[in-house]
Amino acid sequence: NYNYDEKYILSAVIRRDGSSRLSKNIRWGTFPSVSVGWRFDKEKFFPISRDVVNMFKVRGSYGVLGNENIGEYMYQTTMDRNNMTYSFGNQVVTGSAVSTFVDNNLAWEKKKSTNIGIDLALFNNRLEFTAEWYKNVSEDLLYSVPVPANAGVDNEVVTMNAASMENSGFEFSATYRNYDHALKYTISANLSTLKNKVTSLGFSTDRFITGAYATFVGQEVGQFYGYVYEGIARSQADLDNHVNDNGVVITQEGAGIGDCLYKDVNNDGRIDSEDQVVLGSGLPKINFGLNAHREYKGFDLSISTYGALNYHVSDDIYNSLNSSYGYSNKDVSMLEANRWSEDGIYLSDKPRTYIVSNGEAWNNYFSERMIQNAAYWKIANVELGYNFPDKWFKGIVSGVRAYVSAQNLYTFTGYKGYNVDYAGGTFTPGYNFCSFPSAKSFMAGILFTF
């Protein structure tokens, strides 16, 4: 660390880490970082009065971090004796053989971060601003690469250092404090943006598609991938007149009244896997927070909130309960739906159900029906407290505080899942797989300070 006259600031760190999860010859990694800052307001030529600008700092940093969040010994080949036989001396004998394909050169993931920002304090530090641009480049990402079916091994995927991506955006924060009167308060807000781009998937491929999620080089990671939903066939006329952009009637073999209709994207007159397209993103483009704290004659109130905008979620529980196919549990609305009228026109906004597969189960195709706008604003914490006057206790205790608080009080959202705070995977960021709901909790207590 170096600080010259509180104007020029330098900090540098270098660390060396090793992990037994990585291959022996490359399990050690060196990770440096450096940051610099310049207090522009400390210069003699700074043109604005110190009474107005209390701090004007320009800063920048660069650093490298390592990650090896994988299982143990995934770089080691294993032998299997299960049903491994061969002929020896005109007899069938048991042997061993390599049963899985592994990468013997697993190394550290590397995250290279660049940040440039300014810090500004005004009016005797009452008003503070920060603004920052960031770019994070992740290289040698450890992820599951498909193994060719003709490889002669048991595993379908293998963990390798095979991908790279970039995340960039801006972060802003503002805080205002007023402690000059009996009513004291602090208000703060923060906002960050995100732009994600996959720069490489390795091994001469430009795409990685797994089920309802697709990653393309040059685009966002783990986008939703499926069919464009065009409504429900309410009558035979809807089926007969369902045409593509060329006016050709679209063939959906086995589809009937009450089934979902999809767009013929490639205009070949039929619905198949070639009609799948990117449907949306599971990465929030904007994250924000709003917080407030007030004090008045011993009372204090704190409110903490946060939220996210411009992204979608596929909720596994919701989609399963509202699926039109299978024997598993269903939402009661599947029974309550008014599916037919007296003249045979299908009225429900839910497609017809299948107990067993009969041809194409069209209503279970992954489409826009199965993703939801997950924008939300969550009141995360509210606490009201009172600090009793010290004179009441005459030195027995130095302080007494009573408080009540609530966590996860309410979430403003149209999302129908149980939890907006789910954690998706690297290549499935918008997939909420059975995450537990956030418990709403209330507490009351008294804090004694001696």
Model-derived regions, located:
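Glycine-rich, aromatic-lined ligand/substrate-binding cores of catalytic
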Residues: 281-315
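Extracellular/periplasmic, surface-exposed regions of secreted and cell-surface proteins
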Residues: 1-226, 362, 366-450
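Extracytoplasmic gating/loop element in the C-terminal half of outer-membrane beta-barrel translocons
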Residues: 19, 308-401
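Conserved SET/PR-domain catalytic core that frames the SAM/AdoMet-binding pocket
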Residues: 188, 198, 274, 284-298, ...
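Short, surface-exposed charged micro-motifs
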Residues: 119, 240, 291
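Conserved small-residue
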Residues: 160-163, 179-282, 322, 329-332, ...
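Short helix/loop capping segments that flank catalytic or ligand/cofactor-binding pockets
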Residues: 69, 225, 237-238, 302-304, ...
